[in-house]
Regions:
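Cleavable N-terminal export/targeting peptides
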Residues: 1-54
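Repeated loop/turn-to-beta-strand initiation elements of outer-membrane beta-barrel proteins
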Residues: 101-104, 147-151, 183-187, 218-227, ...
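Transmembrane beta-strands of outer-membrane beta-barrel pores
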Residues: 64-72, 99-101, 110-116, 157-161, ...
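Outer-membrane beta-barrel "beta-signal"
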Residues: 298-312
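Outer-membrane pore/translocation modules
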Residues: 116-214, 288-289
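Surface-exposed strand-loop-strand hairpins of Gram-negative outer-membrane beta-barrel proteins
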Residues: 67-92, 118-128
């Protein structure tokens, strides 16, 4: 009994010493945490001052996603011998020149995706097929009226690069005003904009004069980088010729510029919906009544990508 009591006593003493040691270490740790937070605040403040300096500012980040699989004599499947793959890559880059009297902002976005489902019992399905194909570049030049407003001109080009480069293609050229309430937000308002549409075969597309509105937000919160861009064209001649595109990119850095990324794109374009409906109708053995702008189902277009992110 005495041995048990002594053992319990020593165990209690040991726990008390460990508890005291932990409390002492926590007390010693607390002021150091305060110092780190203070230093981090100073670092962030200095970075804000650096970002506010004139001159060129460049950067890029993106997402890479991939999934590959293979089956050999896997008899529970309809196709026991098959391979599948899904690969996606996105790149968001910018190069901005900021001066006291003018600015020149350039940006580019690429999002490409390929998919494959190869049933080895059939020929002709061995390769990857394009799934996502987005290419956008823009250049905005502005002469400042004051700190937040500027007279500006914009050139924006959108197309695909895997399939049918410049078919379809969109080129916006316009002029108006640009509002920059902060260094991270740019809002373009151009009442004079011409939307050129390039298409080799389809008659569903027309170029037109209209208004262009672009809102672009780019920022970084600790390890999180984000970019949102809304681009709207409102045709003066016909609402069916209007379109908008909204893209959002997020990248969270975990280690040495690498982390997790997510990108989501939404788009509405009635001309593209009509062109797709016409092509599907023409492919029928017995084509139906040709679709028109008034009958076509203009569904919301979307794409997304999740995977490994990188920042340069």
């Amino acid at each position: 009994m005495k041995k048990i009591s002594l053992s319990l006593l020593f165990a209690f003493i040991g726990l008390s010493i460990n508890a005291q040691t932990a409390e002492e270490l926590k007390k010693e740790q607390a002021p150091k945490k305060v110092e780190i937070e203070k230093l981090q605040g100073e670092v962030n403040s200095l970075q804000d001052k650096i970002d506010a300096l004139n001159g060129w500012k460049k950067g890029a980040f993106g997402t890479i996603g991939a999934s590959l699989s293979g089956f050999n004599n896997w008899y529970s499947r309809t196709a026991p011998n098959a391979s599948a793959g899904n690969i996606g890559v996105s790149i968001n880059g910018y190069a901005n020149l900021i001066e006291d009297t003018y600015f020149w902002r350039n940006s580019g976005t690429i999002n490409l995706g390929w998919v494959k489902l190869d049933d080895e019992s059939f020929d002709g399905d061995e390769g990857f097929e394009a799934a996502t194909d987005v290419f956008t570049i823009s250049s905005l030049y502005g002469r400042r009226l004051n700190k937040k407003w500027a007279l500006s001109g914009l050139v924006e080009y959108r197309t695909t690069i895997i399939d049918n480069f410049n078919d379809l293609g969109y080129l916006d050229i316009g002029a108006g005003l640009t509002w920059t309430p902060t260094s991270n937000l740019v809002v373009v308002m151009h009442p004079g904009n011409y939307n050129f549409v390039f298409s080799d075969a389809s008659t569903a597309f027309d170029s037109s004069l209209g208004a262009k509105i672009v809102a672009d937000y780019t920022n970084k919160y600790g390890g999180l980088s984000l970019k949102s861009n809304l681009s709207i064209f409102q045709s003066y001649s016909d609402g069916d010729l209007s379109n908008w595109t909204f893209t959002n990119s997020f990248a969270y850095t975990i280690w040495n510029g690498l982390g997790l990324g997510f990108e989501l794109g939404l788009r509405n374009n009635k001309q593209e919906a009509l062109n797709n409906a016409v092509n599907l109708n023409n492919a029928l053995a017995a084509p139906l009544t040709p679709p028109t702008f008034s009958t076509v189902d203009n569904k919301l277009q979307s794409y997304w990508l999740f995977g490994l992110s990188y920042a340069l």
